[in-house]
Amino acid sequence: MPLVIFNSLGREKQLFEPLHPGVVGIYVCGPTVYGHAHLGHAKSYVSFDVVVRWLRESGYRVKYVQNITDVGHLSDDADEGEDKIARQARLEKTDPMEIAQFYTRSFLDDMDRLGVLRPNISPLATGHIPEQIALVDKLVKRGHAYEVNGNVYFSVESFPGYGKLSGRTDLDAVQSGARVGVRSEKHNPSDFALWKKAEEGHLMQWDSPWGMGYPGWHLECSAMSMKYLGDTIDIHGGGMENRFPHHECEIAQSEAANEKPYVRYWMHNNMVTVNGTKMGKSLKNAVNLKEIFKTVDPLAVRFFILQSHYRSPLDYSDTAVAGSTAGLQKLRETRQRLIEATPGTGLLDAAPFSLRFREAMDDDFNTPVAIAALFDFSKALNTALDRPDGLNASSLEAARELFSTAAVTVLGIMTEDAEGGMHDGGRSAETLDEVMGVLMELRSEARKNKDFATSDLIRDHLLAAGIEIKDTREGASWSKTRH
């Protein structure tokens, strides 16, 4: 089936047709780097990572841009309050750029561990001040913006389409409660800041035609997306909490400046809850990824996220993550068994499972249904491999190709060079086998001598290192529990 995407702008699934055949430009709002990444970040960036992976697997040439907000995001997410990075720098008694660079590195490290592919371009807001000033100047000259006391505001009344994404069309009702700051100097309470005058001592400020200041949060994404992807973007993604005001303001300022549609397909991922309660830093229940990774395989966290559709809420609990960890381990064991299998004479048609997987992904990137198809294939594969005649060479090849495409290339829940991969690291894998052979023999001798303390010690230390031992009537076996 052709790819369909739920477009938040039209509030319906729509056939995907990029602006230029065979080429897709996608922009996703990146993090504001003033703290470590949490599970909400993981939900968003894993979801859009799979979108990019599937588009590439489908034959599109994808240019993926994801910004880093290192200035201009105020503490109330609108026009008031202190810059979040400047505030963190003040709290930590250091420079804002040091804060931004430290937490950018932290964010990228977490994304790498989750298997999130790096975007083609990761522009910094501070590296695009001239582009942002030029966009503000263009809006002022076109009559869509005005300056008051060194602040420049976008005039919402000048853009009739304001509210078309969020459905908020009653401008009188769009007050500060909707997170667009109200200032008496604005012509309309709904007007939003494009450029903010820097207060005395402000740590990050630049010269502009309106005096020393810094860009508004909404402005950054418009300027950077248009620079790298053009005036019209195929896909713009982000969390549903950004739909208003952030994305609504992006549309207004971009379309007012260029008189062209800004985005063809708007995609919004849903939010994360913790044990049924909304997650947030203000509620002090934000789940820090680095804390999760101390006890949970990062790829199991990724698998947990993908078991829920990107537009569905994700409820985090220890029980749910444990279930995902166990499920991923079953798939890894099946794949390892598939790698080690030698050709027999039996048959297994992988095509129906491959079709189910592709149809699920073409249906608005439905990863839960795609994963269900992979589990069904895993079950059928194990049944076939249990038979005395096994599987013939062509069936094994087709099965390996399906597992590689689904689990590695598209879902990203396994890697090529780790356990469960099509390649196992060459000499490093041989070395591991040799070491494990010695340890398994030592443990076997300990059990024969009823030295269960030593036997259990070996087992427990290996488990802590990511290797699980299973004792059965046929003997002991081992497998990796993480990459």
UniProtKB/Swiss-Prot annotation:
Keywords: Aminoacyl-tRNA synthetase, ATP-binding, Cytoplasm, Ligase, Metal-binding, Nucleotide-binding, Protein biosynthesis, Zinc. A motif ('KMSKS' region) lies at residues 278-282. Binds 1 zinc ion per subunit. GO terms for molecular function: ATP binding; cysteine-tRNA ligase activity; zinc ion binding. It comes from Chlorobium luteolum (strain DSM 273 / BCRC 81028 / 2530). Belongs to the class-I aminoacyl-tRNA synthetase family. It is an enzyme of class 6 (ligase). GO terms for biological process: cysteinyl-tRNA aminoacylation. Its main location: cytoplasm. It comes from the Bacteria. A motif ('HIGH' region) lies at residues 31-41. Its cofactor is Zn(2+). It is found in: Cytoplasm. The keyword Ribonucleoprotein does not apply. It catalyses: tRNA(Cys) + L-cysteine + ATP = L-cysteinyl-tRNA(Cys) + AMP + diphosphate. Its EC number is 6.1.1.16. PANTHER family: CYSTEINE--TRNA LIGASE, CYTOPLASMIC (PTHR10890:SF3), CYSTEINYL-TRNA SYNTHETASE (PTHR10890). InterPro entries: Cys-tRNA-ligase, Cys-tRNA-synt_Ia_DALR, Cys-tRNA/MSH_ligase, Rossmann-like_a/b/a_fold, tRNA-synt_1_cat_dom, tRNAsynth_Ia_anticodon-bd. Monomer. This is Cysteine--tRNA ligase. ATP binds at K281. It holds the Pfam family tRNA-synt_1e. Zn(2+) binds at C29, C221, H246, E250. GO terms for cellular component: cytosol.
